[in-house]
Amino acid sequence: MSMESKLLDSRIKTRSVKNSEKWLGYLLGPAGALLLNAVLATYLNVYYTDVLNLTGLWGGMFLMIFPIASKIIDAITNVIMGYIIDHTKTKQGKARPWLLLSAPLLTISGILLFTVPMENEKVMVWWVMISYNLFYSFSYTIYNMSHNLMVPLSTRNTKERGGLSVFNQIATIMITGILVAMIFPMVIMPMIGVDRSKWISLMSILSLLALPLTLLEYYFTKERVTEETIGEEKKEIPFSTQLKIVFTDKYTLIIFVYFLIFTFGTTFKNLGLVYYCNYVLGSYNDGITQTLVSVIGGIPMGIGIFAVWPIAKKIGKRNATMYGFVLYALGGVICSIAPRNMAVVLIGQFIKNIGGLPCSYVFMALFADVLDHIEWKSGIRCDGTAMSIYNIIAVALVGICTGLFNMMLAHSGYIAPSIDSLGKTIAAAQPQSVLNAITFSFVGMEVITAILLVFLLRFLNVEKTIELKQEEIFRIRKEEAEKEGKIYKDPETVAREESEKEEIRTREIKLEELKDKCDKNGWNYEEKKAEFIKSEEAKKKAEREKQLNNEKKAKAKEGVKKAKVRAKYDLLPAEKKKAIKEKEMKKQKDLEAFWEKEKKEGTAYRNFVKAKLEMKDIKNESL
């Protein structure tokens, strides 16, 4: 069936986002694939070690090598899939067609992951490798990359886009925070134990559920942005050039090493969670230990967003993240003191997760600063290239960590559970070497990575001059626009004008829809139009008043704050005032010297990149 077929058309016909799109396309639709992936991320390795008993296969080397090799393939397919989506042009958009394809692939590959033949070892090995790569390297890669693009491609209206993003986030939190973190360890896992037939039944149900829900996401989403850009052609910077720019910048390298170390520790912790709760802190699938660790340890993540940004604004994003990792390490040390004591571990996990708040909420903002720095330095935005590397690190490390974790289990003597004659799961008493390996994975590894990150972040000074660099970017853009005889507008003005245009367009669309509704129901359009306009104006007036009140409150609050600081300063002795003034002057002088050095290096590099690109253009024209 061609993508031009009306049967494949989106059920969303409006230019503005409707409730059906939010609830069905962005909340309920993604739930199937997200649930399947979240369960696999937590329990697939448990299935391999405890149900299929693959820990000792090939002397423990199989579960070490195959995840690493598979994730290398996964990393490659991520890059290829990104390229394919960018070059897909159909009536249904560029991402939605791949959502449609992923629906049956997720179901088939999800079932194949668990229906592993046990009779022949060679067949079993090949089945595990092929099914794993079919799901992660193809099915889920196709789904995830197209799914992640749906919000950006849905609309240009920032309010509507923000609303869709919230619904998407609710779907993720609902799945991972409630179903997988609470329901599964409390109810489902104690029921299925290590009974292979029950695992197959459960995962087949989840895989089958992904099919209709992913189709729901396909039919109740719409790529409005793609529809607007059909036919446009843009001059592209060579990927090799962007790659050189990214890998020759110190801040980019620091942020990638940061992400690599952080992901390494986090992945080990996530892999060790189930085993730690089953053998060290609690008993096998006791239904409560894992839930307590996940929920109590995760409470700060829910409330922390209200505290993190005020702190980050006051002391800086880098500093907030760095000090957070000090708490992160402290929490891990507390857990290590008594890893079998529930109260001690929960306290340690709570402190640890408070420390982890800045890196969870602030990292992408720091990453954005680095991307702005790259643009200032080279004159080129390298967002896509940088994000590709970011994704490759994330994907590859999951495989590497899984392989290393399984090697630790195998070489420390891990004993898989068994089923007795009554079908009850019997957990083996693990040797101390296994308990030590599991405890190190869940608790100890992140203590080491947190300390390394505190040291590494000391060198990430991108915030120091980022505002000056952003001003420089705008100045350069203005000069380039004037050379071409164009009028330059700053980003705030452009954003405001685009927002105003979008509001007018949205209003016109709503009026058209209202007219159709009036014609259909025999209503008086002029009366309904007057009511609509009156309602919209009342909403705008209320929003303006609210904004003005908020601005007044913020201004008054800032005034009180400054007055308190000034009063406190006035009470200081003259010597102290002098010392503070000298310190501020030195800080300003150091900043100016730092900026001048950076500015000189940045200008030279930007001119170098520009000259290289011009040479390539001349060479291409001559060909």
Regions found by a protein language model. Name each.
Residues 1-2, 477-623:
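Long, low-complexity, intrinsically disordered cytosolic termini of multi-pass membrane proteins
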Residues 2-490, 522, 564-566, 591-623:
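Membrane-embedded alpha-helical bundles of multi-pass transporters/translocases
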